[in-house]
Amino acid sequence: MNTRKKILLVDDDLDLLEQNKLLIESKGYEVITAVSGKEGFEVFKKIKPDACVIDLIMEEHDSGFILCYKIKNDEHGKNIPVFILTSAAYDTGFKFGASTSEEREWIKADALIHKPVIIEEFVEKLEAFYELKK
């Protein structure tokens, strides 16, 4: 399992933020939250989390991508998983992913997590990332 890894969760929807925080905490993780891309990066620099989960669309349509880009260009961020949380496929029918190296290079995220979050899928992706790093 995990040794109480810190997860930074960034979402401007306060209800979903709290719901996802409780879901992730139920699996033994410590969750620190932020409600915007700007606050998310400030918290990231301060706490140096073990992973980040970032909503795609917050104050701007590309806020999640921008925050992900900033984190992945930070020395600490290069070595941790960053997941984009999105309901874009559900809302628009437009599907995109992070399964190929080209897609991951473009969006900078290690994986996409579709809303609503299925906690088992999230934990599986997170643990798979750490297994690859061993």
Task: Pin down the residues of each PLM region.
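Two-component/phosphorelay signaling modules centered on CheY-like receiver
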Residues: 14-32
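Active-site beta3 strand of CheY-like receiver
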Residues: 47-54, 58
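Non-catalytic signal-transmission and effector/linker regions of two-component phosphorelay proteins
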Residues: 1-6, 114, 118-134
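Alpha4 helix (beta4-alpha4-beta5 surface) of REC/receiver domains from two-component response regulators
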Residues: 62-66, 88-113, 120, 124
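Helix N-cap/capping motif at the beta->alpha junctions
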Residues: 33-42, 63-64
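Short amphipathic alpha-helix used as the core "switch/output" element in two-component signaling
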Residues: 42, 65-78
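Conserved sequence signature across two-component system core domains
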Residues: 10-11, 34, 52
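His-Asp phosphorelay/catalytic-motif detector in bacterial-type signaling
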Residues: 48-50, 76-81
